[in-house]
């Protein structure tokens, strides 16, 4: 394969894995530990 093809596949996989990890952090089990600044400062 050409170098550009390997590089583009690597970048695509990297972006896909980062997106999956951020979605897991936002909506998965670790989201219970996230704080909500709007709930901390109710008027």
UniProtKB/Swiss-Prot annotation:
InterPro entries with a match to the protein in the record: PSII_PsbN (IPR003398)
TM helices/strands, residue ranges: 5-27
Subcellular localization, as worded in the UniProt entry: Plastid, Chloroplast thylakoid membrane
GO CC annotations, alphabetized: chloroplast thylakoid membrane
Biological process (GO), any one: photosynthesis
Q: What is its main location?
A: plastid
**Alphabetical keyword list:** Chloroplast, Membrane, Plastid, Thylakoid, Transmembrane, Transmembrane helix
Membrane topology per the record? Answer: Single-pass membrane protein
What's this protein's function? May play a role in photosystem I and II biogenesis.
Q: Which family does it belong to?
A: Belongs to the PsbN family.
Which HAMAP family does the entry mention?
A: PSII_PsbN
What protein does this entry describe?
Protein PsbN
Query: Which gene is this protein's source?
Result: psbN
